């Protein structure tokens, strides 16, 4: 028994461990959301500001991200992911300040669904942009598509940096969606444990 007259019991210890784990999960989620917001914003800026002008036979041709629809999609998706992460960063900070650690099931479902949608969008954006970048770098001789990166080297390098940054943001979103899945299905796990203990 402690000096306050409150004895230690398995329930008290389990509750303390659960609160500590909840705090760590929330902090991890906040750090990941901050990282995704920053990385997605950097990726969108890198690609959207990328241009290069080359003179080919006295004709100036300007390469810009809007020339490849996959890059436009990647910029839009990263902008959405950055805004979504910023919104949830605020939710995480408010939740940590209030000290509320448990969600209602509808809110947990909404967060889980949103995180899944953004994770899928970011992965799709990176995949589409990587495929287009591979065509630009390697060309496609069967279709007589030439290698663009031999002409626009700086443009291709900056696009590559943007795609790599977007890949890191999409990995972060996949990790966040795993955390939201854990938070959602944990709400259902408690009921099963209580029902099982009745037997």
From Swiss-Prot:
Topology class, membrane: Multi-pass membrane protein
In this entry, the parts of the chain located on the Cytoplasmic side of the membrane are 1-26, 91-106, 186-199
Q: Where in the cell is it found?
A: Cell membrane
Instruction: Please list every transmembrane segment annotated in the UniProt record, as residue ranges.
Output: 27-47, 70-90, 107-127, 165-185
Pfam families tied to this protein: CASP_dom
The superkingdom of the source organism is Eukaryota
Stretches assigned to the Extracellular side: 48-69, 128-164
Q: Give the record's keywords alphabetically.
A: Cell membrane, Membrane, Transmembrane, Transmembrane helix
Xref: PANTHER family = CASP-LIKE PROTEIN 2B1, CASP-LIKE PROTEIN 4A4
What the record says about family reads: Belongs to the Casparian strip membrane proteins (CASP) family.
Q: What is this protein called?
A: CASP-like protein 2B1
Q: What organism is recorded for this protein?
A: Eutrema halophilum (Salt cress)
Give the organism's phylogenetic lineage. Answer: Eukaryota, Viridiplantae, Streptophyta, Embryophyta, Tracheophyta
């Amino acid at each position: 028994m402690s000096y306050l007259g409150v004895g230690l019991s398995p329930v008290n210890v389990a509750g303390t461990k659960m609160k500590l784990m909840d705090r760590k999960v929330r902090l991890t989620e906040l750090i990941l959301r901050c990282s995704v917001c920053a990385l997605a914003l950097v990726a969108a800026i890198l690609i959207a500001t990328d241009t290069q002008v080359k003179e080919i036979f006295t004709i100036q041709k300007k390469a810009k991200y809007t020339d490849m629809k996959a890059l436009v999609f990647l910029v839009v998706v990263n902008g959405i992911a950055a805004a979504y992460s910023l919104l949830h960063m605020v939710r995480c900070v408010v939740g940590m300040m209030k000290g509320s650690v448990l969600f209602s099931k509808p809110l947990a479902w909404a967060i889980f669904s949103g995180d899944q949608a953004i994770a899928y969008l970011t992965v799709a954006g990176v995949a589409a942009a990587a495929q287009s970048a591979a065509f630009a770098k390697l060309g496609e001789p069967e279709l007589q598509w030439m290698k663009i990166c031999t002409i626009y080297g700086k443009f291709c390098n900056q696009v590559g940096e943007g795609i790599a940054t977007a890949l890191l943001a999409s990995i972060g979103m996949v990790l966040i969606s795993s955390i939201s899945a854990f938070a959602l299905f944990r709400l259902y796990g408690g009921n099963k444990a209580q029902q099982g203990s009745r037997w």
